[in-house]
Amino acid sequence: MTGNDLDVLLGAWELTGRSHTADHDDITGTLTATRLLDGGLLQLDGRMLVGNTEIHSLELIWPDDTGSGFAAHVYSGSGAPLNYRWSRRGDTIVHAGLGMTYTGAISTDGATITGTWLPDPDRPDMAEAAYDATMRRI
């Protein structure tokens, strides 16, 4: 994997989604992705509203030492940074951490990413946190 594998994320995005326990879209937000330090890091600055809960996050992503993906730290203002991972295979992007994994399909033109956050198999206790999410480039 190269640092360019996640370049599809560069730019500004609008996020919409629906919790699996909701009967209507209950997730909105924005995400902006930029390169830092001569391209060595990818920064994701996000804001989400999930129901009535507002979430702000800053994520720093870099190629991991094994060359098999990307490591990330997410800072959300609620304590120590959280460890996440990213990978991309063709038109599929994966973002995983804290017992949940997002698998998204990148549209042919790169303007939409549609997917679902699901609990990892060993984390059935996270089932109520599952949600569908669509990112549209703005």
Predicted feature locations:
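N-terminal helix-cap/turn-to-beta initiation motif at the start of protein domains
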Residues: 1-12, 107
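Central antiparallel beta-sheet cores of small beta-barrel/beta-sandwich binding domains
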Residues: 3, 15-103
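A short, Trp-centered hydrophobic/proline-enriched beta-strand micro-motif
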Residues: 10-16, 114
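Short, well-ordered, mixed-charge alpha-helical segments that flank or form enzyme active sites
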Residues: 81, 104, 122-126
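Beta-strand/loop substructures that line and gate deep hydrophobic ligand-binding cavities in soluble
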Residues: 111-118
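Edge beta-strand at a domain terminus
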Residues: 119-138
